Amino acid sequence: MQRIEAMTLADAVFPRIQTDSRYLAWARDAALMLGFAGFVAVCAQIAVRLPWTTVPVTGQTFAVLVTGGALGMWRGAGSLSIYMLMGMIGIPVLAPGAPDVTGTWGLHFILPWNGTNAFPWDISSGGYVVGFILAAALVGYLAERQWDRKPWVHLGMFMGNALLYVPGILWLAYLIGTDWVPAGASKPLGEYISGSGTWNKALEGGLYPFIVGDLMKLFLASLTLPAAWGLVARFKGKQPPDVTPQTPAD
């Protein structure tokens, strides 16, 4: 049986065989996507509540970047889509809400499980949940081109991290501009965030508080994937595979 050359870390750890049936390959990919969706859910429960924003700092960003890098573009995006759908159908996989991280400052570390569930358009952090899908797709696309084992892996992680902020900040700005009142709150979202003007508040509540933490998380993700490739190479006794397409010999 001949193995198909690895394109991503997941393919190197769980290699496909050329004799695998289509259904076996689908089952393998589905299991990987579900498993990494669970990984993101666990990391979402590592949450820090800041007093000046309704969006918590969580371990999700790290998990999203690693998921994209490990699975590749389509499976990475699929895994984060599953994660979003799990929250939409009532499974508490999203980050803890404000009532679960009490006080002006708060920390929650996985247990007891205080995850939430919601449609993305019902929560202030919904734009970021959508952004996770885009970020995983971009990082996965780059990983399929070996960026996850190159010196510029940090750049790819930064690009993915930056991309997830686009829908996140846009959605937050929309909610602030429409005087949206969060569930269980007594005043509009914008009044919980310092600053003046819709866009200034959106940046104050949805970007500035997370810059340092996200730089740390993307740096950690940048170390995790090359290290994982190194372990694979060590246990399999070879270098991380070069996935440059080869033309079959006649």
Which residues make up each language-model segment?
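Peri-membrane helix termini and adjoining interfacial loops of integral membrane proteins
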Residues: R3-A10, A95-F109, T178-W199
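Short, charged juxtamembrane terminal tails flanking transmembrane helices
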Residues: M1-R3, G237-D250
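Membrane-embedded alpha-helical hairpins and interfacial helices in multi-pass inner-membrane proteins
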Residues: T53-T54, A143-D242
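Transmembrane alpha-helical segments of multi-pass membrane transport proteins and ion-pumping complexes
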Residues: A37-Q45, G69, M73, L80, ...
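Pore-lining transmembrane helices
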Residues: Q60-F62, L71, R75-G76, P96-G97, ...
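Hydrophobic transmembrane alpha-helices
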Residues: Q2-S81, L85, I89
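Short helix-perturbing small/polar motifs within transmembrane alpha-helices
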Residues: Q2-R22, R28, V40-V42, P99-I169, ...
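Hydrophobic alpha-helical transmembrane segments
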Residues: A30-L34, F62-V66, A77-S81, S125-V130, ...
